[in-house]
């Protein structure tokens, strides 16, 4: 499953262009730029399922590191600092991973 079913190519490209430089990823700006923050709960769940590569029901640190590559093959991996900041922002219960409800709250936040 690809994001084409949820997001527009132009929005994905704009969002990725905004965080090409190492250390420049900001999840709030990215979710807004790609249009995910304005999507329905069902569409957000679809996005979560795409990012949850191992289908564990959670997005773990390794999946976050490769987050941008879900949107476009060849996109850069997040740095360790970006990955940890992203995880901290979304992991509201402190279990070291992001569940679907935490993901939805982070997108709408």
Curated annotation (Swiss-Prot):
PANTHER family: PARVALBUMIN, PARVALBUMIN ALPHA. Keywords: Acetylation, Allergen, Calcium, Metal-binding, Muscle protein, Repeat. The N-terminus is blocked. Coiled coil: none annotated. Signal peptide: none annotated. Ca(2+) 2 binds at residues 91, 93, 95, 97, 102. Ca(2+) 1 binds at residues 52, 54, 56, 58, 60, 63. The modification N-acetylalanine is found at residue 2. This is Parvalbumin beta. SUPFAM superfamilies: EF-hand (SSF47473). It comes from the Eukaryota. Residues 39-74, 78-109 form the EF-hand domain. One of its GO terms (molecular function) is calcium ion binding. Belongs to the parvalbumin family. In muscle, parvalbumin is thought to be involved in relaxation after contraction. It binds two calcium ions. It holds the Pfam family EF-hand_7. GO terms for cellular component: cytoplasm. InterPro entries: EF-hand-dom_pair, EF_Hand_1_Ca_BS, EF_hand_dom, Parvalbumin. The keyword Metal-binding applies. It comes from Scomber scombrus (Atlantic mackerel). The keyword Acetylation applies.
